[in-house]
Amino acid sequence: MSIVSFCSSLPAGPHGFKHGRGTRDMVHMPCIVRRTARSPAQACRLLRWNKYHCAAVPTNSSLSPSPTPLDVEIELDLEPFLIKYKSGRIERLGRFGDRTDYVEASLDPATEVTSRDAITDTGVPVRIYLPKVDDSPPNSLRVLVYFHGGAFLVEDSASPPYHNYLNNLASKANILIVSVNYRLAPEYPLPVAYDDCMEALNWVNKHSDGTGQEDWINKHGDFDHLFISGDSAGGNITHNIAMSTDAPKNIEGIALVHPYFFGKVALETELQDPTNLLLHRKLWSFITPESEGLDDPRVNPLGPTAPSLEKIKCKRAVVFVAGEDFHSERGRKYSEKLKSEFKGEVPLLCNHDGVGHVYHLSVDATEEEIESAAAWKMMTDLLKFYKDNDVVLEGSIVESLKAKTTEGIKKMKEIEKGMSERMMEQLVAFYNGKPVPYSS
């Protein structure tokens, strides 16, 4: 089926990226000759349109004026994160928002949270979020070190979803947040991300005596209440740092949000999603070439060689699980193991039914973003059924399908917004040492 028959009207947008510890020039992807698409993502790339409106791809994905066959032949497909071509070229797809529209650190008028960027003593970039303090006593803000998600391959501390989310969290929890911009695979395979995050955490903790590099942390940070947290890959990082003997001894609590765990033997819920199952079977070895496999304790804390979770020395722990998330069953099993082995207070499990992986990062989607997401889902569904290149879909059929899909996504966004508010309520309670509602 020619993809042009039903998505030629989709929005065009600029393409560019920022990753790791630097910025590449943003460029427009050269026009590519229309040809038959084998997948929705390929269709989007051919028509200068990404999964999310104006989502960016890296500069090194742009074809040279005279591309060789190896520039377009796929070696490894890790959609929705990236694609590696036989030439070695990496094409990042980006998961949320406009990859060219990174948010500058600044005062956020809506939350009155101020942010600024800094570099640690070992060269790791971080972004610091300071809630409105007014006449607050010195060192009265609890401290959270946050690790963003993105499969260790994409995202950034300046990505709009993370910047907006952390502004909101800093304001509602009245907590000082340091978001770590760790280096990404495959350019920097694991354990580089673990090392960067550990270095950043220890750098933050050096401010506990008031003589650190950043005056905001020196003046306002309460290091009797130090927390670490992250979502997806960041949840994995949180677990691995908490297990390490190099972690500070004064961590009060950890919060794992939809943590990225996997294993050699697929769980029942994972077998029900063959697309994600195949993706994750390829992912770990790509980001960790030196790994011993999918039962590596760093990705499978439930595996046969995984150490006891009693190594986690903090006082409190909470795990968040999304009911429709591919990783949900492992998150629950991790929580069960934590309850049997953790030596601190009884760990909490917060289960959110009916929502998917890191849903809380996209609850404020614009009408344009909803339409783009609907178009993507529509393409995914259609390509499952139409394999013949000669099939042409009439515009009226396409518009009807798109309208139904858009309405469905709008309803889902309403559910996600309600669950996101519940998650925020639970996190605020956890960080402030209060009973966490709706937890088990």
UniProtKB/Swiss-Prot annotation:
Which keywords does the record carry? Amyloplast, Lyase, Plant defense, Plastid, Transit peptide
Disulfide feature: none
| Locations listed in the record | Plastid; Plastid, Amyloplast
In terms of pH, the activity is described as: Optimum pH is 7.0-7.5.
Which positions are catalytic residues?
Answer: 232 (acyl-ester intermediate), 325 (charge relay system), 357 (charge relay system)
Expression tissues: Expressed in the pollen grains.
GO MF terms here are: hydrolase activity; lyase activity
According to UniProt, the reaction catalysed is: 6-tuliposide B = tulipalin B + D-glucose
Q: Name one GO cellular component term.
A: amyloplast
Question: What happens to activity at different temperatures?
Answer: Optimum temperature is 30-40 degrees Celsius.
Give one GO biological process term: defense response
- PTM comment, free text: Not glycosylated.
- Identify the domain of life: Eukaryota
Pfam families referenced in this protein's UniProt entry, alphabetically: Abhydrolase_3
UniProt-listed Enzyme Commission number(s): 4.2.99.23
Query: Transit peptide extent?
Result: 1-58
> Which InterPro entries does the UniProt entry name for this protein?
AB_hydrolase_3, AB_hydrolase_fold, Carboxylest/Gibb_receptor, Lipase_GDXG_put_SER_AS
Regulation of activity is described as: Inhibited by Ag(+), Cu(2+), Fe(2+), Hg(2+), V(3+) and phenylmethylsulfonyl fluoride (PMSF).
**Assigned protein family:** Belongs to the AB hydrolase superfamily.
Quaternary structure note: Homodimer.
Function comment: Lactone-forming carboxylesterase, specifically catalyzing intramolecular transesterification, but not hydrolysis. Involved in the biosynthesis of tulipalins, defensive chemicals that show antimicrobial activities against a broad range of strains of bacteria and fungi. Substrates are 6-tuliposide B > 6-tuliposide A.
Name of the protein described by the UniProt record: Tuliposide B-converting enzyme 1, amyloplastic
